[in-house]
A protein has these predicted regions:
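Conserved SAM-binding strand-loop segment of SAM-dependent methyltransferases
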Residues: 2-14
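Conserved Rossmann-like nucleotide-binding pocket used by diverse enzymes
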Residues: 8, 27, 56
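A short acidic, Gly/Pro-enriched loop at the edge of an enzyme's catalytic core
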Residues: 16-26
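A short SAM/SAH-binding and catalytic strip from SAM-dependent methyltransferases
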Residues: 24-38
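A short glycine-rich, Lys/Arg-flanked "PGG" loop and its adjoining helix->strand segment in the class I
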Residues: 39-54
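Conserved class I S-adenosyl-L-methionine
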Residues: 54-87
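Substrate-binding/catalytic lobe of Class I Rossmann-like enzymes that use SAM or dcSAM, i.e.
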Residues: 84-145
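C-terminal lobe and adjacent flexible extensions of AdoMet/dcAdoMet transferase-like proteins
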Residues: 120-190
């Protein structure tokens, strides 16, 4: 079926442009964790899909305000201490709460994204993308790992990703990123 693609941007915290029962697809890239009224936003998104419409998400779903537990922080610090100095992050692995004055909606309800999503959408596909260690170490530190000819960088990047997968799968660190495809529970009954 030929369909015209119409797209627009809207503010997740008020969604003034969105219309009910109107969209074949919604694409979300890391905006739901900024929703101050997450339940309201999810309901509006769900209402806006046509009966066979899908929502595609790549989203931050880690701890609210990026505040991991002390136990998780210690695991991150332990893994990072294994790295040579040049690969270690110079930034806080758990950011001070004062940092959120700059962007007050950053990760405001990120820990509720998955459960709220599942309240309004049936999961068609989902995959945890981990990140509980690797993202924290690589964030603002990726340049040391970017040279494709640097064998040492490749080795330590693989090490980070292995530890990230291991500790995420064991539930010892939070999964920070989640990919999902969902179908509205509301529109699926229309």
């Amino acid at each position: 079926e030929n369909r015209t693609i119409n797209y627009f941007l809207d503010d997740i915290n008020n969604l003034q442009k969105i219309k009910p029962n109107s969209y074949d697809a919604i694409f979300n890239f890391a905006i739901l964790h900024h929703a101050t009224e997450l339940d309201n936003a999810m309901k509006k998104l769900s209402d806006s899909l046509k009966p066979n419409g899908l929502i595609f998400n790549e989203e931050y779903v880690g701890p609210a305000r990026n505040q991991c537990t002390d136990k998780q922080l210690n695991i991150m610090l332990e893994v990072m201490s294994d790295l040579p100095k040049r690969f270690q992050s110079k930034h806080h692995l758990r950011p001070p709460l004062a940092n959120f004055r700059v962007e007050p909606t950053e990760a405001i309800h990120s820990d509720l994204v998955i459960s709220t999503f599942k309240k309004y959408f049936d999961i068609v596909f989902e995959r945890n993308m981990n990140g509980g260690i690797a993202y924290q170490v690589l964030w603002n530190n990726i340049e040391e790992f970017e040279n494709p000819n640097d064998i040492e960088a490749e080795k330590w990047l693989e090490y980070l990703l292995e530890k990230d997968t291991k500790f995420s799968n064991e539930g010892k660190v939070s999964v920070l990123f989640w990919y999902s495809v969902g179908k509205s529970k509301i529109t699926s009954y229309k």
